[in-house]
Design a protein with these regions (language model features):
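Active-site glycine-centered loops adjacent to acidic/histidine catalytic or metal-binding residues
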Residues: 111, 173, 211
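Active-site loop->helix "elbow" adjoining a glycine-rich segment at hydrolase catalytic centers
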Residues: 112-114, 121
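Short catalytic/ligand-gating loop segments at beta-alpha or beta-beta junctions
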Residues: 168-174, 198
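N-terminal beta1-alpha1 cap of cysteine-dependent amidohydrolase-like domains
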Residues: 1-108, 119-120, 126, 130-162, ...
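Short, conserved active-site loop motifs that form the nucleotide-linked donor/cofactor pocket
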Residues: 167, 184, 205
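Active-site-proximal beta-strand elements of phosphoester/diester hydrolases
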Residues: 206-210
């Protein structure tokens, strides 16, 4: 045990899902942050922006976890096999995201989290990849998708972290980025051109469309880098 290590560790806020009156968070998110050397703190869903500001003031970084559909910046109509995000969650997530953006504290958006990060910056989202992207792969595990490859842009932060040009990732989404938000650029894509990772020009905001927390045997370096960034 090294108490001094944890005294110096960054505090990382993690958002949650919300269903049937309960906040839900998969343990793998906690595990990934702790293994990387960060102290995970679950952010409650609250309506008051003042309360959120007080709560998050001492945090060093933010992870926005996966979730259901987003209507912010939506292009097209949502299909029947995707659920909408609860208004309480989306409201709280947008507020906490805005607080971190204003302070330019490090942000890692995962799946829904990447889409929200992009939409908050004025970007657009496809409602249904398979209907709107010509030649699209099946990206939804609900529709039977498994793994697919992504091509990582050389020189990007993601490329520096992973050290490779191609990577096999899981895929659990029906929506995808249609148009990048202000300040963002794509750093990875699937074979059909669907954006799989984004980074902001300030170097502090990053999003991935896949779920690295469910592939920690090969994706832990992503969280390790995020924690180093939060120091």
């Amino acid at each position: 045990m090294n108490p001094q290590k944890w005294e110096q560790a960054p505090w990382i806020g993690i958002t949650t899902a919300y269903k049937a009156g309960k906040q839900i968070l998969e343990f793998c998110y906690i595990q990934a942050i702790e293994t990387a050397g960060g102290i995970p703190l679950i952010i409650p869903i609250v309506k008051s922006t003042d309360a959120l500001q007080t709560l998050t003031a001492g945090l060093d970084g933010l992870v926005i976890v996966g979730g259901p559909a987003i209507t912010l910046g939506l292009v097209g109509d949502l299909p029947d096999d995707i659920n909408l995000t609860d208004p309480m969650r989306i409201g709280s997530d947008k507020n906490v995201l805005e607080l971190f953006i204003e302070c330019e504290k490090p942000i890692l958006g995962i799946c829904y989290g990447m889409q929200l990060l992009n939409a908050q910056a004025g970007g657009k989202l496809y409602a249904d990849i398979e209907r709107q992207v010509p030649g699209a792969l099946n990206h939804s595990h609900i529709r039977g998708a498994g793994l697919h490859s992504i091509e990582i842009k050389p020189g990007s932060r993601l490329h520096r972290i992973m050290g490779i040009n191609h990577l096999e990732v899981n895929t659990m989404h029906i929506q995808a980025i249609a148009e990048l938000g202000e300040g963002f650029h794509a750093t990875a894509a699937a074979p059909d051109g669907v954006i799989e990772a984004i980074e902001h020009r300030n170097g502090r905001f990053m999003g991935v469309q896949f779920h690295p927390e469910r592939m920690l045997d090969c994706m832990q370096p992503l969280f390790d880098d995020f924690i180093r960034f939060c120091h």
